[in-house]
Regions:
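Entry/capping segment at the start of metal-dependent catalytic domains
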Residues: 1-78
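Short helices/loops that flank or line small-molecule/ion binding pockets
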Residues: 116-119, 137-143
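Second-shell loop/turn segments in exported
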Residues: 56-59, 99-107, 120-127
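Flexible, solvent-exposed short loops/turns enriched in glycine
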Residues: 81-108, 167
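Extracytoplasmic
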Residues: 42-45, 63-68, 77-85, 96-98, ...
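Conserved protein kinase catalytic core
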Residues: 57, 80, 92-93, 138
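Solvent-exposed coil/turn segments that connect beta secondary-structure elements
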Residues: 52-55, 73-76, 85-90, 106, ...
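Flexible, polar/acidic helix-loop-strand segments at domain edges
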Residues: 39, 141-188
Length: 188
């Protein structure tokens, strides 16, 4: 579902607002030496997906990444696996500087964030997609909203604020208003 949202969003944004393609020089990408010869990574394309806390249209250095997802695409079958990296995970950001992993994007933009993922997780990421809050709202609207399906037995554990969310659909504006908050007040 997330990959579908990102693909639809990238298409929508490219058609409606324009996409800025930023190339990172190959020599600026850091990978562990063992990664190049790792047979397990052959036939896969790994892409970093960043959701940044940018209320304006700036998507580069200076914005913390609220969401970090690695999309691993099997080039033979087309299967996609997504792995979320918790933003508060304490990792080496480079030069033996340890911090929450979302600080890598703030300190050095997508280049440092990709290098942080490659170094700590033994990956070969060279490509990325970044979406800010405005882009997120546009993506959600473009696909007709997002349905959040939380089961009754899960609600009690979600900040103890929710009453019911089963089948609730929000448009981009409402989702945008609640994204990044510590809790979401929901009514039936």
């Amino acid at each position: 579902v997330l990959l579908l949202v990102l693909i639809a969003g990238a298409w929508f944004i490219s058609r409606g607002t324009g996409v800025t393609k930023i190339n990172i020089k190959e020599e600026d990408i850091v990978m562990n030496e063992t990664v190049a010869n790792n047979e397990a990574l052959k036939g896969y394309r790994n892409i970093a997906l960043f959701g940044v806390d940018a209320r304006d249209k700036s998507l580069g250095k200076g914005n913390r990444s609220d969401t970090i997802i690695i999309a691993s695409i099997n080039e033979d079958t087309g299967d996609v696996k997504l792995c979320s990296v918790y933003r508060d995970t304490y990792l080496n950001l480079g030069n033996d500087s340890y911090n929450k992993c979302n600080a890598a994007y703030a300190k050095g933009g997508p280049e440092q964030a990709i290098n942080m993922l490659n170094m700590n997780l033994d990956l070969n990421i060279t490509d990325y997609v970044t979406v800010g809050f405005t882009g997120l709202r546009e993506v959600i609207d473009a696909i007709g909203g997002v349905t959040i399906d939380v089961q009754e037995n899960e609600i009690v554990h979600l900040n103890n604020y929710q009453i019911s969310m089963v089948g609730k659909t929000d448009d981009g504006e409402n989702y945008y208003a609640t994204e990044g908050k510590d809790y979401i007040a929901v009514t039936s």
